[in-house]
């Protein structure tokens, strides 16, 4: 009978078994990559809001600016504007789609100044809002399908009008900041102007 080197040399067999029984060693992978601090803060805030079961945390300046303010880019008339921007900016309420949302093409500082304008009735006349003195371009998003993420579908409406907002006092910075965008009211098609009380007046 022919003998193999393993059967003729037991020591060789033991060495081979020793190699096979050693714990598997994985090569260490360098996963130390830098992430911008603002992106990490946004991600942590998103996870906290996503898991939160109690009342929604009051909005901060950074949150309002990130979710509402937009810059020139995709045409505001684009049919999928809301679907893409709401997903990109993580505009959700916990695990549900928001029923409506506004994107405004303006600087945050300009939006903040509206908090000190005259009061006018909000949409549906429920509360008092502050209204912008000038016209602002933006997009109104209205939920049409689904209620839970990620299946939210919106219809987009381009608007150019007066912004109605509610404001809240933020203790950390000791000033009023925009709280919610209540409406973006388009002016009448016919010629009109605003009087000192912020009311539309039609010339005779």
Swiss-Prot record:
GO MF annotation list: nucleic acid binding
Location relative to the cell: Secreted
Cellular component annotations (GO), alphabetically ordered: extracellular region
Sites carrying sugar chains: 130, 142
Annotated InterPro entries: RNaseA (IPR001427), RNaseA-like_dom_sf (IPR036816), RNaseA_domain (IPR023412)
Domain of life of the organism encoding this protein: Eukaryota
CDD domains on file: RNase_A
One of the Pfam families matching this protein, by short name: RnaseA
Signal peptide positions (record): 1-26
GO biological process: defense response to Gram-positive bacterium
Keywords of this entry: Disulfide bond, Glycoprotein, Secreted, Signal
Disulfide bonds: 97-152, 115-167, 122-129
Chain's role: Does not exhibit any ribonuclease activity.
Family of the protein in this entry: Belongs to the pancreatic ribonuclease family.
Protein name: Inactive ribonuclease-like protein 9
Taxonomic source organism: Macaca nemestrina
Taxonomic path: Eukaryota, Metazoa, Chordata, Craniata, Vertebrata
